Amino acid sequence: MLQGFHWYSEGDAKLYENTKNSADYLKELGISAIWLPPAYKAAGGGYSVGYDPYDLFDLGEFEQKGTVSTKYGNKKQYLDCTKTLQEKGISVIVDIVLNHKAGGDETEKFHAIKVNPENRQQNVSDPFEIESYTKFTFPGREKKYSAFEWNFTCFSGVDYALNQEEGIFQIIHDFGDGWEEMIDDEKGNYDYLMYNDIDQRNPFVRKELNDWGKWYHDQVHFDGVRLDAVKHQSPDFYKEWLYNLRSNTQKNIFAVGEYWAPGEVNLLQKYIDTTEGSMSLFDSSLQQNFHIASKEGANYDLRKIFDETLTLLNPTHSVTVVDNHDTQPLQDLEAPVEKWFKPLAYALILLRENGYPCVFYPDLFGANYTDKDKEGNEQEIFLDKVEKIDELLKARQEFAYGFQRDYFDDANSLGWTREGNDDHSGCAVVLSNKDAGEKNMPEVFFTITSAGFQKK
């Protein structure tokens, strides 16, 4: 899989066109699926990355939030892109953001309780009336596709109230008592993340989101979904939502959730269990291990690279990443893997049998952008294309098959062999985070050099 964007991807409605034009190259490299960014209108209009969703039914079709197109293009360009990818044999993974909404059209008055941001179970006020932008009428769409209007009873909390200092306000209504139940007690309860938090206990909301899922598939015919921020949403909701989506479309739609909890692999497994295996999850612990290994250099014991990871615990439900739009430099979860280690990290996810690897867009194409760091200083970032990434992707296609034997017997060098099958010869891989060395393994099938593959 390729994550076909990053936080600072080009604007000006170019992404869909450029992705469509890259389809042949991506297919040649063995990319079998592309995860595209949120495609619906966001509060930030044509400048938004897409994680502040406003109208799920506006795929770049209506004049809303100051634009018809999203940052990435209009609806026609989007559908042309997805159709071309699928015609080339590349599956389309769409980004689903159902945790929150932003950019309400009107304010409403309702009762709420202010809570401690570090412990959302601790109230810091009695119930009182606030006013906030919780009314969504979508005037630019004029009820096309759906007449549903959102009001304060559709949300469990907000982070903004008129005439109040900023904070987290738990909304009082008849569809739920307090926050929705989560599987972990981080921050007391981490249901609330940002903006207007959707209350998925409301049966009218659940029906609207189920209906929207079918509508979205009818429009795009996508093959899979990436589910944003599942850490902050009830596993019961997504178990139901995915069941309905698959039933309504009569397709075994692939699903991967974002539950970002580095070092807490048991929470990831608990979420998978609670959703009855209906989705995979990104292996945030493995990404953290890559980050730490790249920082520590030769002091890192490579034999521990898969310790406490989902890829080790539950490989069939693990999607492996080296970096993503949240861990890249200058982002909230910044934990980038250093340049020298990235070829090793990609070998570890592309050439082994466990996990479903996901390549990050800048690692394949490079990126250059400017933003402020945590101290407020402007920084220019250059992300180079990962050395040998094309060769590693081709090696996966040609050689990474068959039974795997591991040689994890040295702190600074790892090796493994793949024994191949009737159509593929197999391979041997050796990695080192120190000086060059040797490792005795039964057979070496190829090496990767600047000239390409050299078989032995």
Q: Model features per residue range: what roles?
A:
Residues A23-Y25, S48-F57, C81-I90, N99-H100, ...:
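Active-site-proximal helices and loops of the catalytic beta/alpha 8
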Residues M1-L15, Y133-K144, F152-D174, K270-I272, ...:
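An N-terminal domain-start capping segment
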Residues K144-F204, D218:
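Long, low-complexity, polar/charged, intrinsically disordered or flexibly structured peripheral segments
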Residues H6-S9, Y195, T327-P329, A367:
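A short, flexible beta-alpha/helix-coil linker loop
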Residues E10-E17, Y72, K76, P203, ...:
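Soluble non-cytosolic domains of exported or imported proteins
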Residues M1-S91, N99, E106-K109, K144, ...:
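N-terminal structural segment of carbohydrate-active enzymes
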